[in-house]
Amino acid sequence: MFAAGYAYSNQYNSMRDYLYDEQIRDGEVFKCAEQDQRLVHLSAFQSCLSKEESALRIFEIAPREYVKDKYLFEQCGVTREDVVEFQQQVKPLCQNVYFNAHSIWDEIKDWPFVKMVESNEWLCNSIIHRIDGIVALPIASNFILSFSGDCLSIPFICKWITNKEGKMSLNDITSRFNSVFGTTFNRSVIAEKLRSSGMWSQIITDEIDGYIDSLADNSNFDVDSLLDEEFF
């Protein structure tokens, strides 16, 4: 029995048993968006998914869509050993502080494993995420990876970009961020994260007052309320 009014039968010894017997079935794609949201938002369910992904027993083939290992292996003609070998081969490419499959795609796109999984960038990213020691920041239709969670945030990633390439306009940092990591941010999200972190002047060449004025001119919302919004 769990909070939020959700329970599984006592015939199951664990959430993992319930997950495998009742949810992620052989030959089917488990889509979180189509499930009872009371279930998919349970911390126990999320924890179970994460553990099974780390053990390479289930795979995320698209955002919040999962299949069992057997399904992936049969559909793509790969083995568990192929997945582990891919992780071992790709790890040396993950030398930047921040990375994901998109940021190294030019280097891996012609690998046999990548072609066998039909160049599924999301799947490759989720497999890379499960390399020991890597943590993830889910954002804007993708997720960014790092071996250090201490500075894994949008402002620090922007600072990392400008440390290498110099300060930029808000439009340019938004474009560069999306280009490197395959994200879909609009500039208002980047702006709010930089403003609230106090790192605007370290990264952006535009004056922050001018940006706030432009919001006031183009929005029917209260500016303070808009800037206080939590996006993630």
Which residues does each predicted region cover?
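C-terminal non-catalytic scaffold/interaction domains in large multidomain proteins
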Residues: 1-232
